[in-house]
Structures are given as C-alpha cells and as structure tokens.
C-alpha cells in the first residue's frame, strides 16, 4: 500500500518510520511512504504557502496552489483516497481504519496547518476529511501519523499474529478484557484465579463478561451499538 503525505515538516516522520512495526512494514515493502513538501511547489521565490483569509479573521490559511500541485505531482493508483486531517472531519474509528486498509491502494494524507486550508482544497481535491476528535492540535502531522500507524498495522504481514487483531478493542464494538502476566502475586494484588486455572472455556467466559462490563461502564456509546447489533 502506498502513502503520500503532504507535509510542511517531513522530518516529523523520520523517527516513527524507522521504528517498531512501521519500520518493519516499510522494510518488508508491505507499505511505501512518500513525503511531499508543498513548499517545493510554491509559486514565489520565498516559497510561501500561506496567506491571510479573505474577509478578515485571525491567523493564516494554507494556499491552494502548492497543495494542488503537490497532489497532482503524484503517481495515481486505481483505488486512491485523498484525506485531509482537520478538526472538521469525521472522527477516526477502528472501522474507518479497516475500511482504509482494505478498500484503497493509495492514501494521500494532507496535513493541515495554521487556521486550516483554502476551502477549494476541501471542495475539489479532498475525498475524505478525518479528525482525531473534538480538540485542536498544532499541526496535521500528528493525526496523519495516527492514520498511517492504524492502517499499516492492519495490512497483512505487519502484525505477527493477525488473529490478535480480531480480538482487540473496538473490533466487535467491545473494549478489550483485562490482561495479566507474571508474577501471579504482585504486592497484595493477585491475578484472577480463573486465568490460572487452565480451563479455557471458563477463561473465555470470564473475558467476555469483562468486556461487557468494561464497555457498559466506560463507553456507553459502544455498549448501545453492541446491544443493537447483537440483539
């Protein structure tokens, strides 16, 4: 899968792309990441990419010309999505990550900055807007890296035991169950006996019940969705 990231700060991605599962996925050519700086496509000698908004207002906007030129310089694969990282976008979720990982061969991630981008970018270039939630960050690189990480780990061959992906939080609209490792007794806190019993049926029942109780308590929105989907 190919990722083209339109960013004013390519160095932001250097360390993450060399580390952990992302680095391994790139080494194995499961994914390819291309960093494109729109400043290289600016029209003036100062490589200016921002300007004041028409009608007045606080802050600066990213100009349309460098962004359009940066995206139009890319190789186009058949199944491509052009994503703008913006607080106005659809909140990111596990189903969205899975859709992006399965339905597309190329993701173009545009990192917003300042007060945002010229609306013509959104109207005539972008095919999807994504947000991390109801809050504002200083740059679009953090959301873009989140999407990159979330999608790549779902690609076949990235995670060693792909079965584990199906058991994670949100995959079935339930949060994950509590997990423990050795020692069985730490200070005065003991691992639940059922997990040490060797009774796999009892363990599965306990884990399912923990998922249900945890989701009801912590994420009533997910619990409502789960009850609707599961009768």
From Swiss-Prot:
Its main location: cytoplasm. It comes from the Bacteria. GO terms for cellular component: cytosol. This is tRNA (guanine-N(1)-)-methyltransferase. One of its GO terms (biological process) is tRNA N1-guanine methylation. It is found in: Cytoplasm. Pfam families: tRNA_m1G_MT. Specifically methylates guanosine-37 in various tRNAs. Its EC number is 2.1.1.228. Belongs to the RNA methyltransferase TrmD family. InterPro entries: Alpha/beta_knot_MTases, tRNA_m1G_MeTrfase_C_sf, tRNA_m1G_MeTrfase_TrmD, tRNA_m1G_MTases_N, tRNA_MeTrfase_TRMD/TRM10. Disulfide bonds: none annotated. The keyword S-adenosyl-L-methionine applies. Homodimer. One of its GO terms (molecular function) is tRNA (guanine(37)-N1)-methyltransferase activity. It catalyses: guanosine(37) in tRNA + S-adenosyl-L-methionine = N(1)-methylguanosine(37) in tRNA + S-adenosyl-L-homocysteine + H(+).
